[in-house]
């Protein structure tokens, strides 16, 4: 019985994660400054499985309303590369207006990162309607006091 209990405790803790084991790990929660975004401040969460989430206030764009972003990332040497996508809705008609994909590349330095990001826009049929040149992207890790 004790062995079974010990096994159950070990298995339940197997999925638990603490702070990143590497000081330059992207895994964690970040306050992000994207100077070219309609609303420049965002929250990013990078998960250990290569997925990520993005959120920011919806008030930055008067024409479209956007969802939270969901995306993917990979380590490439000492750099992080990734992309997230959000759904766009027309504020007047309340209809699907397309998507925006934001590609990024950055380098993590302990509790900060610096890099660039570049958006691409797609209409409701999935046809690219525009893109922008890369602009600065910086982040500060959310830490406990």
Give the role of each language-model region.
Residues 1-4:
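Positively charged n-region of N-terminal signal peptides that target proteins for export
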Residues 12-15:
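C-terminal motif of bacterial Sec signal peptides marking the signal peptidase cleavage site
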Residues 17-23:
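Bacterial lipoprotein signal-peptidase II cleavage site
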Residues 23-39, 71:
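Tryptophan-anchored aromatic micro-motifs
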Residues 40-81, 86-87, 112-114:
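N-terminal glycine/threonine-rich, aromatic-flanked beta-hairpin/loop signature
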Residues 42-46, 69-74, 99-108, 118-119, ...:
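Hydrophobic/aromatic beta-strand elements that line small-molecule binding cavities or substrate pockets
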Residues 77, 119-145:
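Edge beta-strand at a domain terminus
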Residues 83, 88-110:
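Acidic, glycine-rich flexible loop segments
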